[in-house]
A protein has these predicted regions:
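Conserved catalytic/acceptor-binding region of the Class I
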Residues: 131, 135-201
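Class I SAM-dependent methyltransferase SAM/SAH-binding core
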Residues: 56-101
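A short acidic, Gly/Pro-enriched loop at the edge of an enzyme's catalytic core
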Residues: 100-111
């Protein structure tokens, strides 16, 4: 179980509880997202990449074709179990560990990635370690993708239903924001690039239901089995009011931090 006073009012959560749904329904990043990363010059052939809080290995698996050497890490044993199963036939090394407890040699990676997870880290511990692990002029990519509930009736109604069962869930109400460097990074890293864009992602009733169930407010929460089943019944009833196929607007951001030279 994880716990952070700034997330969900300090309630415990565990992504390992949601791993099966996470593996099935959260591999939804569009090709445009991966292409943006490659266009910036990262996660390509000849590079060593460390993916922090890799979950079920979504980023390494989808970017493996670009030729980089990947290591994926996650604190959840169950997440890593699914990552390994989904990565069969791919030469990706997975490690069970929190980001803060990892230990690698200096100058070991060209790129470090953190996708949809940066808010969970202890930044005062992680940034000095990341700086040490990266090669000179190495890059730390912090990425995020969120649905926009104020621009989608269905997304808003889904959020309301999550909050009905888990009022402490703080992952709601996302809006566009300016991409800026975290304060803790500024002594070690400079901003090399910022990227942000909107995209409409396609869903069916089933895949949107699965995506919401796999969020921190339901599948990874401490709700009991009966509560989750009741939520599922209500959410499926809500979805029956909408077409079988639809799109949900999302906002994507990439923050590219470059190691500051000591020279």
């Amino acid at each position: 179980m994880l716990k952070n006073e700034h997330i969900d009012c300090g309630k415990e959560f565990d992504w390992g509880l949601a791993s099966a749904d996470y593996a099935k329904y959260r591999d939804i990043y569009p090709n445009e997202f991966y292409n943006k990363i490659v266009d910036l010059g990262y996660c390509k052939g000849g590079q060593r990449v460390l993916d922090l809080a890799t979950g079920t290995g979504v980023l390494p698996r989808n970017m493996y074709k670009y030729g980089a050497e990947w290591i994926g890490t996650d604190i959840s044993e169950n997440q890593i179990k699914f990552a390994r199963e989904l990565s069969r036939g791919l030469d990706i090394n997975y490690i069970i560990s929190s980001a803060e407890n990892l230990d690698f040699p200096e100058n070991n990676f060209d790129v470090i990635t953190a996708c949809q997870c940066f808010m969970y880290f202890n930044q005062s511990v992680l940034f000095p370690k990341a700086y040490k692990w990266l090669k000179p002029n190495g890059h730390f990519l912090i990425m995020f993708m969120a649905w926009l509930p104020f621009e989608s009736e269905l997304a808003m109604e889904s959020e309301k239903l999550v909050l009905k069962y888990n009022p402490s869930w703080s992952g709601r109400g996302m809006t566009r924001y300016e991409v800026t460097a975290p304060e803790m990074s500024k002594s070690l890293f400079d901003v090399a690039n910022t990227v942000s864009f909107d995209i409409d992602l396609p869903f069916t009733r089933e895949t949107w239901h699965g995506r919401i169930k796999a969020c921190r407010g339901i599948g990874a929460s401490n709700l009991n089995t009966e509560e989750i089943l009741n939520w599922e019944k209500e959410h499926k009833k809500l979805l029956s009011l909408y077409p079988e196929h639809f799109t949900i607007p999302h906002y994507v951001t990439i923050l590219d931090l470059k190691c500051r030279s000591n020279g």
